Amino acid sequence: MFEDIPVDVSPMHEGERIRSANMFVELAGPKSIGAELVQVKDEVEDGKVEVKGPEIDEMEQGQVYPFAINVEVAGSELEEELESVIERRLHELCNYVKGFMHLNQRDQIWCRVSTEAKDAGFRLEHLGKALSVLFREEFPIIESIAVTLMTDEAAVQEFLETAREKYETRDSRARELSDEDVDVFYGCLMCQSFAPTHVCIVTPDRTALCGAINWFDCRAAYKMDPDGPIFEIEKGEVLDPERGEYANVNAAVEENSQGTTDRVYLHSVFGYPHTSCGCFEAVAFYIPELDGIGIVNRDFRGETPLGIPFSAMAGQCSGGKQVEGFSGLSLEYMRSPKFLQADGGYHRVIWMPRELKESVLEFIPEDVRDKIATEEDATSIKDLRRFLRDNEHPVLERAAVEETEPEEEEVEEAYPEETPIPEGVPVMAAPEMTLPAAGGFRIVLKNAKIYAEKVIIKRK
């Protein structure tokens, strides 16, 4: 079946991580552009695989290239409603190919090819052939399939614009339905190869964290493959309509998370927030100093007012963990009328990147639009506090915000000998961070990067 492909193709490789040291090239991701799209057509040249742009053996090691995947399928039983369902399986099936890593979805894809795969003779043409076979196996209703892979920047840019128009068409349809209109929700387990205890709950008002699967997509997927990774959940008893807690959802999450999580609030970052996988489009995070919520999206390269970027924050709550005060979410959920409704919705949001704010501006209530800060208004807690006060943000009504900053006692700086930090060790970077202490003093770390397995503070 895969005899002419120089690397192994098997589900056993799903979950493989390709680190920088083992990487030949990176495709799309945060340093470039990319997209993926599946389109149902009336006719398709079956088995056609085309590569537009440099092939793997024409690329320079260590470089980053634009990348797009366009899959066209045809079949008498195929419907346009199934496009996003098939498309989301690209994540899973690409990872079947040894030496090829696929992360995220839609226009957020991030791929890598290992040096080992390149040395074995792997090319993008082989990826296209593998996808053709795998999709036919996964979806027997596909009668013909063609795959186009792009690494030419102009071709990827043009395709990206087309793909985004398609994404918006799908998303806008789902906005017409609400949780109260249906009796069934859905669960999705597609990310469990990377986040074994994560169970994604999809409702009309809460799109999957990846942003690629909405309630209609799940319904179509379940009808087509009732034994697949997407399953039905009878809505059943509503335990808390404001937080979005349902008895059957709790039971489904407990069963499919290996008992790790037994309660979930669909519309709150507090108490029992929805678990996070790793391919979420944004993170909502609590800012305790101001009793407000910040949101940072994957595309934002700067630091949040907490002093850490998206990547560090994502590492704190991904992998299927349930971390109070943090929750991965999709950008489409930010357009939902139930967006974090238990926490106050946008009236509790105090910071987000400018581009993200502009993309959801029409869904932010008018009375608070100009009161939510961006990186252009505030880059620290101090700046943010001042902005909120000057603009009379409603979050100030929840708790008093300090008018003055407490005095800080300068501590003599020490520079311990640097020790190389192995890859994968948790890192926290912060321009200013206060550590809890006792005895009438406190410790303030400024412009700190901390690599530590243990911190011991002793008073002589």
From Swiss-Prot:
GO biological process, one term: acetyl-CoA metabolic process
Gene3D superfamilies per record: Bifunctional carbon monoxide dehydrogenase/acetyl-coa synthase(codh/acs), Chain M, domain 3, Bifunctional carbon monoxide dehydrogenase/acetyl-coa synthase(codh/acs), Chain M, domain 5, Carbon monoxide dehydrogenase alpha subunit. Chain D, domain 4
Annotated catalysed reactions: Co(I)-[corrinoid Fe-S protein] + acetyl-CoA + H(+) = methyl-Co(III)-[corrinoid Fe-S protein] + CO + CoA
Cofactor: [Ni-Fe-S] cluster
Family matches, as InterPro entries: ACS_CODH_B_C, CO_DH/Ac-CoA_synth_bsu, CO_DH/Ac-CoA_synth_bsu_3_sf, CO_DH/Ac-CoA_synth_bsu_arc, Prismane-like_sf
Positions of the UniProt region annotated as Disordered: 402-422
A single MF term (Gene Ontology): anaerobic carbon-monoxide dehydrogenase activity
Binding positions ([Ni-Fe-S] cluster): 188, 191, 277, 279
Enzyme class: transferase
EC annotation from Swiss-Prot or TrEMBL: 2.3.1.169
Biased composition (Acidic residues): 402-416
Binding note for cofactor: Binds 1 [Ni-Fe-S] cluster.
Keywords of this entry: Acyltransferase, Iron, Iron-sulfur, Metal-binding, Nickel, Transferase
Xref: Pfam families: ACS_CODH_B_C, CdhC
SUPFAM superfamilies xrefs: Prismane protein-like
Subunit: Monomer. The ACDS complex is made up of alpha, epsilon, beta, gamma and delta chains with a probable stoichiometry of (alpha(2)epsilon(2))(4)-beta(8)-(gamma(1)delta(1))(8).
Family: Belongs to the CdhC family.
Database matches in NCBIfam families: cdhC, PRK04456.1
Job of this protein: Part of a complex that catalyzes the reversible cleavage of acetyl-CoA, allowing autotrophic growth from CO(2). The alpha-epsilon complex generates CO from CO(2), while the beta subunit (this protein) combines the CO with CoA and a methyl group to form acetyl-CoA. The methyl group, which is incorporated into acetyl-CoA, is transferred to the beta subunit by a corrinoid iron-sulfur protein (the gamma-delta complex).
HAMAP family hit by this protein: CdhC
The name this protein goes by in its record: Acetyl-CoA decarbonylase/synthase complex subunit beta
Organism whose genome encodes this protein: Methanothermobacter thermautotrophicus (strain ATCC 29096 / DSM 1053 / JCM 10044 / NBRC 100330 / Delta H) (Methanobacterium thermoautotrophicum)
